[in-house]
């Protein structure tokens, strides 16, 4: 049986994020709502629930402290060093099932031992893994002298990415 109390975690809900990951989130949300299991939603930031006409209009979305930072909603990716810590601050207590939809940090949401965590991973954090060198070669910031700092941050992100994957009960990937 499908649990009554379900939470959904995604990296962010912003007007500019309308890719494949967001379409999957919408489809899973519609499926759960259709089964009379409207999930509690959580994200680093939410710029959608207050927008008229948005599929999230009127929904209560739990967010991280990034929501309150300057340009947190519009430029959430600029806070990359803080995102792993920020996703861990979102409290999903009370949910029996947590479904995360991850292309960056959502799978890192903390769950209790009595919660089942299912994570659908769209892609690895490619700019931290297999595309790191290409990413750094295109980054003006990396070429301006911050390269060593950015490399260290991407190294830390890879370590956290591996650790957070170990905390998930079931990991699903949409590719190899």
Segments and roles (model prediction):
Residues 97-99, 111-143:
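Active-site proximal beta-strand in glycosyltransferases
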Residues 99, 167-175:
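A short beta-strand/loop micro-motif in the catalytic core of glycosyltransferases
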Residues 5, 96-97, 116, 170:
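Structural motif
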Residues 21-32:
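Short amphipathic alpha-helix
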Residues 2-18, 44-45:
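Nucleotide-activated donor-dependent transferases that construct or modify glycoconjugates
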Residues 137-170:
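Membrane-proximal helix-turn-helix segments that form the acceptor-binding/catalytic region
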Residues 34-107:
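Active-site donor-binding segments of glycosyltransferases and PAPS-dependent sulfotransferases
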Residues 102-103, 121-123, 175-176:
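Helix N-cap/beta->alpha junction signal
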